[in-house]
Amino acid sequence: MAARLCCQLDPARDVLCLRPVGAESRGRPFSGPLGTLPSPSSSAVPADHGAHLSLRGLPVCAFSSAGPCALRFTFARRMETTVNAHQVLPKVLHKRTLGLSAMSTTDLEAYFKDCVFKDWEELGEEIRLKVFVLGGCRHKLVCSPAPCNFFTSA
């Protein structure tokens, strides 16, 4: 069973953030504020980095009690096709990092909710989840598969 994460948008930074959903929440997303995101230059990860969780392909900071670094990520299977992915998602995300016009934040949020979490949480396909850090996170991946080139298709 995959670890449950809450996906939240940080409009100030225009990034998606992952936060672990605690057992006390019974699977519901956090109702509190987004909280303080760690600085991309920070390399310290608290001891409770969540190595006991069964999730693969996420940086260790994703399980930090202080919250993960800002992440942009996608689902590997969706990257391999243009079906259900507006304008090929990796290119869209790259344009956004350069400040160019691309998919709206609302469209991105809908994409991740519909494509990522449906397949990941409901179907249990967490092994296929890939994380692409486009903004300075230097943490190592947990149980990382072979390196993946962000700009090439599988």
Curated annotation (Swiss-Prot):
Subcellular localization(s) per the UniProt record: Host cytoplasm; Host nucleus; Host mitochondrion
Keyword Zinc-finger: no
GO cellular component, one term: host cell nucleus
Post-translational modification: A fraction may be phosphorylated in insect cells and HepG2 cells, a human hepatoblastoma cell line. Phosphorylated in vitro by host protein kinase C or mitogen-activated protein kinase. N-acetylated in insect cells.
Ribosomal protein among keywords: no
UniProt-annotated stretches for the region Mitochondrial targeting sequence: 68-117
Database matches in InterPro entries: Transactivation_prot_X
Organism domain of life: Viruses
Biological process terms in GO annotation: DNA-templated transcription; symbiont-mediated activation of host NF-kappaB cascade; symbiont-mediated arrest of host cell cycle during G2/M transition; viral genome replication
Assembly and binders: May form homodimer. May interact with host CEBPA, CFLAR, CREB1, DDB1, E4F1, HBXIP, HSPD1/HSP60, NFKBIA, POLR2E and SMAD4. Interacts with host SMC5-SMC6 complex and induces its degradation. Interacts with host TRPC4AP; leading to prevent ubiquitination of TRPC4AP. Interacts with host PLSCR1; this interaction promotes ubiquitination and degradation of HBx and impairs HBx-mediated cell proliferation.
Function: Multifunctional protein that plays a role in silencing host antiviral defenses and promoting viral transcription. Does not seem to be essential for HBV infection. May be directly involved in development of cirrhosis and liver cancer (hepatocellular carcinoma). Most of cytosolic activities involve modulation of cytosolic calcium. The effect on apoptosis is controversial depending on the cell types in which the studies have been conducted. May induce apoptosis by localizing in mitochondria and causing loss of mitochondrial membrane potential.
Family affiliation: Belongs to the orthohepadnavirus protein X family.
Name of the protein this chain belongs to: Protein X
Organism annotation: Hepatitis B virus genotype C subtype ayw (isolate China/Tibet127/2002) (HBV-C)
